[in-house]
Swiss-Prot record:
Localization annotation: Cytoplasm
Gene Ontology BP terms: coenzyme A biosynthetic process
SUPFAM superfamilies tied to this protein: Nucleotidylyl transferase
Species whose genome carries this gene: Rhodococcus opacus (strain B4)
Name recorded for this polypeptide: Phosphopantetheine adenylyltransferase
Task of the protein: Reversibly transfers an adenylyl group from ATP to 4'-phosphopantetheine, yielding dephospho-CoA (dPCoA) and pyrophosphate.
Keywords: ATP-binding, Coenzyme A biosynthesis, Cytoplasm, Magnesium, Nucleotide-binding, Nucleotidyltransferase, Transferase
Upper classification of the organism: Bacteria, Bacillati, Actinomycetota, Actinomycetes, Mycobacteriales
Domain of life, source organism: Bacteria
Family: Belongs to the bacterial CoaD family.
Pathway info: Cofactor biosynthesis; coenzyme A biosynthesis; CoA from (R)-pantothenate: step 4/5
Length: 164
């Protein structure tokens, strides 16, 4: 059985993420979408909320499961018996950063990274940009799954109420 891990912060999951996850799921027997935990960053959503949104958003992909990890990705991949990391690339800036990470991961563990070019429809999308636009009242409804969009608007309203 071939498997891959598809890591990210997914804060929140976007349609761009789902495009890459779906395409990876078509190539591998199993894809583990892994919410990477960075203790130095406070996300808009908790890790548990991100997992829940990912599980809901990938429910139609039977060979996809969702998890989280707080250490080196290659350690997780080895623990799971996974030999490939799948990353989406939006453009040259992503490539420059991701190539260095891929080379380090390969050196540390022998785990290879496979790059999937992002569908041009989503090449501008990032969770950070979506959050920023939504915070200022921009319409991001076509950039996220419907339930994720609703949760994003609710969370932004909660944060605004807390700060006023």
């Amino acid at each position: 059985m071939t498997g891959a891990v598809c890591p990210g912060s997914f804060d929140p999951v976007t349609n761009g993420h789902l495009d890459v996850i779906g395409r990876a799921a078509a190539q591998f027997d199993e894809v583990i979408v892994t919410v990477m935990v960075n203790k130095n960053k406070r996300g808009l959503f908790t890790v548990e909320e991100r997992i829940e949104m990912l599980e809901d958003s990938t429910a139609d992909l039977p060979n996809v499961r969702v998890s989280s990890w707080h250490g080196l990705l290659v350690d997780y991949a080895k623990q799971q018996g996974i030999t490939a990391i799948v990353k989406g690339l939006r453009g040259a800036n992503d490539f420059d950063y991701e190539l260095q990470m891929a080379q380090m991961n390969q050196k540390l563990s022998g785990v290879d990274t496979l790059f999937i070019p992002t569908n041009p429809t989503y090449s501008y999308l990032s969770s950070s940009l979506v959050k920023e636009v939504a915070t200022f009242g921009g319409d991001v409804s076509d950039m996220l799954p419907e339930k994720v969009h609703a949760r994003l608007l609710t969370r932004i309203a909660e944060r605004a109420a807390e700060s006023s």
